[in-house]
Every structure is written in C-alpha cells, then in structure tokens.
C-alpha cells in the first residue's frame, strides 16, 4: 500500500516501511547557506540543526507511528544503522510517547536469522548512535568550512569547487606522497646472471648468488665489472657440481574468513574496483544471499554451523561437488583471523542459494568469490614439497655459485575449492650432492631498480585501515569521491595536478587538514562514545578546537594559499601551447556548462577545440608528440574514456569519410539527400543528411566502436542495419538495426517512467529510488548524484552517474 506516496508492506496487523538510509540529516541553519556572505570560519562555532532529508518518508513514518501499538527498528547492524534507528525513534516519539520500541539486529536477511532476531529483540544502543551522530557533525564542520575556505580563496566556485574533508585529505596525501616517492626515485643499475643446468636431458634454470657483507644471500650484482667476471666464468664452464641439496615440506594454510578489507582485496584480484565490489556485495546482502558486507571480523561466531551451511551448498547445482567433498571430513574446523568483533560475522554465504540466472555476470562472480572463500576456510591445508639445489662452477678467477628452487604441490587442500591463489610449480629434478650437471646458455641481464608501486585501491584501503583513516563502511566511498572530484585518475589511482596542489597548500598552510593522526584520533574518540567512555558534546567540542587552530593558520596565509591553489588549478587545466598564438590552450567551460579547449589569450586569440559532451575532462601526463598537447580523459562513471590529444581528435573528425546509409527521409527521393554516419569535431557521431545545413535531419549514434552496415534492410524505412563492433575491450557487437527505428525505441524508453529499464536498477533498487523521491527516468537524470547517493544505502555517486549516462 502507499502512505503519503511511500510504499509500505502490510501483512495481518503489521506494516513495514523502508527508511532508505538517513531520513534526518545535520546541516547549518539557512542563514549560513550563502558562501559569499558567510565567512567559512563562522561554521566552526555555528550550531548544527537536524532536518528531514526525505520528507515523504518522515511524513509516512509519523502517520504510521501515531496509532502503532509496538515499533520494531530493524536498520543495519552497525554505527550508521544505529543512528538511522535513533532518527526513527525520535520521529516516532514526537507522535507516540507510549508504544514500546525495540531494536532488532541481524547480519543476514534469511528467514531463520530474521525470525530469530524478532523473537529476541534488544534496546537501541544510544551510545553507538551518538558515535554516528558525532561523525556526521564532525564531517559537516570540517568538510563544509574547509571546502568553502579553499574554494573561495582560489575563486573556484560552482560545480568545480575544491572539496576537502577530514578523511579525504589524509587519503589524498597518501596517494600524493607515493607519487612524490616515484618522482624522486633515482634508479640504480644492477645485473643478474643465469645458466641452464641439465641432468638426463632435463634442463632447469639456476641463478647466480653470493653472500653479501651481512652474510646474506644476494642475487643482484651492483658492479658491472664483477658481473662481467662472473659471466665469463659461467660462459667458460661446461659443468657445475652440486654442492647442496635441501628438501623440505611446507604447509600452506587456508585463508582466514573475509572481513571487508580482505574481501575488497580479493575482489580487486578478479577485476572489481573497491566501490563496485561493495555495491555488488550490498545487493547480494539485500537479496539475502550473503551476510552483511561491512565488518572487521575475521572469526566466525560460535553459533555458525559450518556443516549446516555446507549441507545447503551441497544441495545446490554449482558448488555441490566441492561442498560434498568437504563434508566427508570427520572434523570441520574453520580458520580464524586476528580480528574478532561482536557486531557482524565475517562475510560468508547464507543458505539462500541463487542460481546464475538470478544474478548478473558481475554479481555471480562476486558471489562465487564469497562462497569459495567460505569453502576454503573449512578446507584442509595444502602441502608443498620444496627442493633447493646449489651448484658451484670452477672458474679461472672465481668459483661462482648457482641456485635453483623447485616446488611441487603435493596435496592441493583448499586450492581445490579456492582457485584465486597461484598453484604454479617450478620443476627441478632430483640430484645428489657431488653430482656433475651440464651447464649451457649462460646469460647476464642488465636491470634497474624500480620505484615503489602506486597504491592499488585494495592496498590503499589496507593502508587506510592500518593508519586508522576512515572506517570499513566509508573507505571505498572516500576513494570513489577522489575520482568523482577529479583528484585522481586511472587504476591504480594517480593524483592529478589539482590533487598535488591541494596537498601542497594544506601542508604549507595547515598540515592538520591532511594529517592521518587527526582523523585517526577522531575515529578513536567516536569509538569511545560507542563504549560510553566519552560524550557526543565532548568529542564535537574537541573537534571544534582543532578546527579553530587550523583556521588560525589558514586565515594568516589566505592570499598565499589562494595564489598557490590558483596556480595549481591553472596547471591542471593547461593543455599545451596554442598553435595560433604565444599563449597556452586551457580547458574552459561555456556558459551552457559544456567543456572546450580555448586559448588563454582570448579575446586576442579565439582558437578553440571541442571536447566531448559526455563527462568531465582531466589532463593526463601523456603528451601528443605532434602537437605538444596533453591527452584528455573524460570522467563519466563506467563510460569514462580517453579522448586523447584534442587537436588530433578534431583533425581526425574532419578527415574521416562519411559512411552513406541510405536516402534521407526529410529530403525525399527528389531532394537528393542521403543519410551518412558522420564524425563530429567533438569526437561524437551522428547519422545526418549529406545536404546539411540545407537539411538538418539527424539521428544519434554511439560515440565508441566501429560502425558497419549489415545486410538486413528495414522493411519500413528501406535503410540497412548498423552494427557497432569493439576491438579494444572484448565487448560483443551491438546491433542497432535501422537507425530510425532504433531512435524511436530510444524515445519510447525515455518517455516511459520505468526505472528498471536502466542497467543495474532492479526491482529493489527502483523501490529505494522511489522512496528517495526519484519516481522515473526523468527524475533520475535531473538528480544530483552526491545527494541521491547519500539517501540510498549501498549506492555511490559514481553508480548514480552510470545510471544517468545509461539514461542518456
């Protein structure tokens, strides 16, 4: 049924309403809303007020609560869920002071666990909720005041304001610091030497090694003359004598259960970003297939019966054989990690089993990862046999030593059910000490030391966890916001020039903004609130004092800070030299909101280049060898793409021949116009009339992929079908068919109100969107991604942008 436009589920005398995330938020009073009229420092001491963020849900909840005899709060079982529950509690109490209110907690949405949770309810944890509220207030104070200060100082307002926050700043500094290490790295030359050894026609590779000054084995030779001497000795020898043979057996223990961080790490290994992995996991949890995906726990609770879950999996079609093989064991003892908490169990499958047909390919891939991790935790250890062989060579000036390490998987153990870890073997034949081996093909390889690797998303999350930056529930969202704001690009994330400028300015004028100690201390304070050892007011007052000290330093250096940021912003937008003047080409924005490349010498020089209409441009480090212009990348969610050199793109668009499709329906047979696939200077494409501008009839076309005509002809319009093929990413060809029919179908979809026509939006997600006030595709397209994402659990701004891109 509908209550004030909100879907409510009814059975018997019970009614259930979904809150769809926070329904009440914190904000500053309206008199602080004008960025230009209010000094940012005033926000440090400004009072914070609560206000409904989803008024329709609030109204529905109040109406239902007035006559309710009993209220159960069953929000997510974590800090944010407890705060959402407290928001509901306070709204109910405004209209109903008598009805009992209890708290129901569960970690998986299965019939058994939900039924048991409602049979044994608890009280709301107001301390835990206060910790969540403290986080809200602190994030608002730091984020709003610092974002306004930096943006105003740099005169960078509108959609391109400079965003900063208490968790975002330290995370960005981690990425920038690593990039500085890479830039400052001075590679050193070294050499490695190898030779092939043979016994009974079985050849294996051995590497040269020596003992360094610390009596430790080393295989890198830092002096070229020494490397040459070793090579001469190896190349001049025909045999090597076995000096040492060592055999050992190694136990390879199964992995610990998944917590959030380790899940993200494993998901990245199969190609999923942190944000995408968590989004999929949230959907699987909501569908009842896995337990709650936000957890620090790596120890299964005592009430989890692995054998029962294996029985359920054994009855399923996809994991039955693997689960059945594990049930044969007399004793099933799961592994345990180092972290044990009492809120949520580690991530594992429930006994609600989907089939591949129930899930998308991505969802099934992540679900299988979770299932197989559980199977691995109750499987036996694997066993490896290792063989180390050391052989010496008799040379004229020195007797170099060679070593080879062989390994063989004797018992696969958990690897049989968990194929995500390497089981590659290295064969070395059995030899005996004193045995002579034939030596052939000596070789020397010149190498250089490599700079430290950039943080991959999963490793960045692990580092944030170790340093106390953010929480299990927020770290992946923080990284996604860095992408959304244009602070990082690529994977692994690489800082843009703007990111460097913000970090440099923060370090110089107020280093607390990017200090991990500050955000880690605040996280510790919030945990103290949850334990009842501190109060919300104590923590927020402490945070105000810290923020006031930051503003003392910032205010003293406002002019210098603004200059520094403006220089960084200009560098971040400078594409390269203008071909028609002595000025630079920079990325600009038209008064209509679209991006283009224009000369910094305007109006004296009016040279411009178009940019694609989809996405937000950022500059890459790669430079066009022909024009000296930086390559441009367009950020557009999952449809992000590299546009390349804007001058090359414009020239290519002008040179690309049109592909004639057929007669133009506007011109008619006597008009002589033909429809052709045309490439625009912006990089886009359309099907348009060859008589343009006399005839401006056109139809949209996908930007990417190669267009070709098919043999099938439209019976209604007499036009051949169009097929789009993709050579670079393995996607299946897209048969558009007749371009006129295709466009009519597109218009029909756009005119519709069905949200589920968008890829990634199923029935449950569509319901969440409607509860957040988005009723149809048109409403989705006009929504502000960050605001909408804040209202829907498990959905990030990038996901919203992907939906909007699909809707376009």
Predicted feature locations:
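Basic, low-complexity terminal or inter-domain segments flanking catalytic cores
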Residues: 13, 91, 296-753, 775, ...
């Amino acid at each position: 049924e509908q209550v004030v436009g909100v879907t409510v589920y009814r059975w018997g005398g019970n009614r259930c309403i979904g809150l769809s995330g926070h329904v009440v938020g914190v904000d500053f009073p309206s008199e602080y809303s004008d960025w230009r009229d209010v000094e940012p420092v005033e926000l440090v001491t400004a009072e914070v007020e609560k206000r409904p963020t989803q008024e329709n849900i609030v109204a529905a909840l109040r109406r239902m609560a007035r006559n309710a005899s009993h209220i159960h709060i069953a929000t997510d079982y974590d800090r944010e869920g407890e705060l959402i529950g407290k928001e509901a509690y306070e709204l109910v109490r405004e209209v109903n002071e008598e009805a009992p209110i209890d708290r129901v907690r569960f970690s998986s949405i299965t019939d058994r666990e939900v039924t048991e949770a409602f049979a044994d309810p608890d009280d709301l944890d107001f301390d835990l909720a206060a910790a969540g509220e403290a986080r809200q207030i602190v994030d608002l104070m730091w984020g709003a005041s610092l974002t306004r200060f930096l943006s105003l100082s740099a005169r960078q307002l509108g959609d391109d304001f400079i965003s900063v926050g208490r968790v975002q700043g330290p995370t960005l500094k981690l990425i920038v610091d690593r990039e500085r290490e890479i830039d400052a790295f001075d590679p050193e030359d070294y050499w490695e030497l190898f030779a092939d050894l043979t016994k009974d026609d079985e050849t294996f590779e051995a590497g040269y090694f020596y003992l360094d000054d610390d009596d430790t084995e080393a295989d890198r030779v830092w002096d070229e003359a020494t490397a040459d001497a070793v090579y001469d000795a190896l190349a001049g020898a025909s045999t090597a004598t076995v000096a040492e043979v060592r055999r050992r057996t190694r136990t390879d223990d199964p992995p610990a259960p998944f917590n959030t961080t380790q899940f993200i790490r494993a998901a990245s290994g199969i190609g999923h970003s942190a944000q995408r992995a968590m989004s999929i996991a949230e959907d699987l949890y909501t569908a009842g297939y896995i337990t709650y995906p936000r957890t620090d726990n790596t120890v299964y609770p005592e009430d989890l019966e692995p054998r029962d879950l294996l029985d359920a999996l054994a009855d399923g079609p996809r994991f039955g054989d693997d689960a059945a093989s594990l049930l044969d064991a007399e004793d099933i003892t799961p592994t345990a990690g180092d972290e044990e908490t009492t809120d949520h169990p580690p991530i594992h499958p429930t006994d609600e089993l989907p089939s591949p047909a129930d899930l998308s390919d991505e969802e099934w891939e992540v679900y299988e990862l979770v299932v197989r991790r559980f199977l691995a935790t109750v499987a036996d250890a694997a066993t490896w046999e290792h063989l180390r062989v050391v052989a010496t060579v008799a040379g004229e000036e020195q007797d170099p030593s060679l070593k080879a390490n062989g390994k063989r998987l004797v018992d696969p153990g958990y690897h049989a059910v968990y194929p995500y870890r390497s089981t590659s073997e290295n064969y070395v034949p059995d030899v005996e000490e004193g045995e002579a081996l034939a030596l052939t093909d000596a070789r020397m390889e010149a190498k250089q030391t490599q700079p430290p690797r950039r943080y991959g998303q999963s490793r960045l999350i692990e580092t944030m966890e170790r340093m106390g930056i953010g929480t299990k529930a927020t770290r992946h969202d923080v990284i996604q916001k860095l992408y959304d704001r244009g602070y990082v690009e690529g994977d692994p994330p690489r800082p843009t020039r703007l990111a460097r400028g913000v970090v440099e300015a923060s370090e110089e004028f107020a280093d607390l903004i990017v200090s991990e100690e500050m955000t880690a201390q605040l996280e510790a304070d919030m945990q103290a609130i949850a334990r009842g050892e501190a109060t919300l007011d104590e923590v927020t007052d402490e945070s105000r004092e810290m923020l006031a000290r930051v503003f003392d330093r910032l205010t003293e250096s406002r002019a210098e800070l603004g200059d520094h940021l403006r220089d960084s912003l200009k560098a971040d937008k400078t594409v390269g030299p203008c071909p028609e003047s002595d000025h630079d080409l920079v990325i600009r924005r038209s008064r209509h909101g679209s991006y283009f490349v224009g000369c910094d010498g305007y109006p004296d020089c009016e040279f411009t280049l178009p940019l694609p209409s989809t996405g937000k441009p950022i500059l890459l480090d790669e430079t066009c060898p022909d024009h000296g212009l930086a390559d441009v990348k367009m950020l557009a969610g999952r449809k992000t793409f590299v546009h390349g050199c804007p001058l090359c793109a414009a020239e290519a668009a002008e040179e690309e021949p049109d592909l004639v499709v057929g007669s133009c329906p506007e011109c008619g047979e006597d008009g002589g116009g033909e429809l052709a696939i045309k490439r625009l200077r912006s990089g886009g494409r359309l099907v348009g009339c060859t008589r343009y501008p006399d005839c401006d009839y056109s139809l949209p076309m996908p930007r990417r992929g190669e267009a070709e005509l098919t043999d099938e002809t439209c019976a209604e319009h007499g036009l051949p079908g169009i097929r789009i093929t993709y050579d670079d990413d393995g996607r299946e060809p897209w048969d558009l068919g007749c371009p006129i029919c295709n466009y009519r179908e597109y218009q029909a979809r756009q005119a519709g109100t069905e949200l589920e026509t968008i890829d990634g939006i199923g029935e449950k997600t569509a319901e969440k969107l409607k509860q957040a006030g988005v009723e149809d595709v048109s409403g989705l397209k006009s929504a502000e991604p960050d605001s909408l994402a804040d209202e829907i659990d498990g959905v990030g701004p990038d996901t919203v942008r992907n939906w909007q891109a699909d809707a376009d």
